[in-house]
Regions:
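Active-site cores that bind ATP or allylic diphosphates and position pyrophosphate for catalysis
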Residues: 171-176, 182-183, 200
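Acidic, Ser/Thr-rich low-complexity intrinsically disordered segments
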Residues: 245-268
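Flexible domain-boundary/linker segments
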Residues: 58, 107, 160, 179, ...
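Active-site beta-strand->loop->alpha-helix modules in alpha/beta enzyme cores, enriched
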Residues: 1-173, 185-186, 205-209, 261, ...
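Sparse, context-dependent recognition of short Cys/His-centered cofactor- or disulfide-binding micro-motifs
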Residues: 26, 128, 143, 178-180, ...
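A conserved mid-domain beta-alpha-beta active-site/ligand-binding segment of alpha/beta enzyme cores
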Residues: 184, 189-252
């Protein structure tokens, strides 16, 4: 018997079965001890659900390093009829993962896109000020936001929203910047972060709390396949063309830099792979003025 036929058949069977799995309502898993007196990580999520998809590194920071993780709901989606429900789903998803949640406005920010930015709309400037205030108040050690070609207009808009908000910080403000990808793949990621089966399963479970979204499109079932494709891409994009691929099954790709002195600065020489066997805290062990090494 051809084993590859069985392999593909099992994948197809699991996806079909997964469509009947419960959505949300799962008991909260054990929580790690959190170091409340240290700067947090902030995830600037363009939409409710992004925190569950690109949050592999953030989840490891919380579970391995005891870091507070705050998910900032940049928008609550474009469908006004769903914004209240999406916030409720987001609260449940964040609670399941152990992330804190911060709203930007009663129903989230609106028109977060490059057109609003180019038009110089007052609403855009007001949105930038909201994000700038969040950065100044929380003084995060790490922030997550999409890269500048992440295809979706709100994802790209969120990138520039953060760029503009960072530019409004005081000269001494510094933090690590982790650019994320989902809709559009990064051409130059420099960080490949492995996720365990447990972490990925918990992220999928949290994603299932976004009931209204996954009912219309069960994309939560395809996150493992996306993470497997990240292993394929990351093996060469991060590890180097023709290099040996890391022994990962699931991973997420990021671009890690540092905001310091009013600008983004490269801190990795080449790329870095972070397996589950290495504590994620080592990734940010360098002092603010020190360039991280592989």
């Amino acid at each position: 018997m051809n084993p590859y036929h069985s392999y593909v058949s099992e994948l197809a069977r699991l996806v079909r079965e997964g469509r009947g799995f419960p959505l949300g309502g799962f008991p909260i898993p054990p929580r790690p001890a959190i170091r409340s007196n240290t700067p947090p990580a902030l995830i600037f999520s363009p939409h409710p659900d992004d925190e569950c998809i690109i949050g592999g590194l953030a989840l490891r920071l919380m579970r391995e390093a005891g870091m507070r993780v705050i998910n900032v709901a940049v928008t609550q989606g474009s469908n006004k009829a769903r914004q209240v429900a999406r916030l409720a789903e987001l609260k449940d998803a964040c609670d399941y993962l152990g992330f804190e949640l911060l709203q930007t406005a009663a129903q989230g920010l609106e028109n977060i896109n490059v057109k609003a930015r180019a038009d110089g709309a007052l609403a855009w400037q007001a949105s930038v000020e909201i994000i700038a205030s969040i950065l100044a108040e929380h003084r995060p050690s790490v922030i997550f936001f999409p890269h500048d070609t992440d295809w979706n207009s709100t994802h790209i808009g969120t990138h520039y929203l953060l760029v503009d908000a960072l530019a409004r910080q005081s000269p001494e403000f510094a933090c690590h910047v982790v650019e994320t990808e989902f809709w559009g793949a990064m051409a130059t990621p420099n960080l490949m972060v492995e996720s365990s089966v447990t972490d990925l399963a918990d992220m999928m479970t949290a994603l299932s709390f976004h009931v209204g979204e996954v009912q219309r499109n069960p994309y939560h079932l395809l996150v493992p396949a996306w993470m497997q494709d990240n292993v394929r891409r990351g093996g060469e994009l991060v590890g180097g063309q023709g290099g040996a691929a890391p022994d990962f099954v699931f991973c997420t790709l990021y671009r890690l830099q540092r905001w310091s002195g009013g600008q983004l600065q490269a801190i990795l020489k080449g790329g870095r792979s972070l397996p589950m066997s290495v504590n994620v805290a080592t990734l940010f062990a360098a002092s603010p003025g020190e360039r991280a090494r592989e």
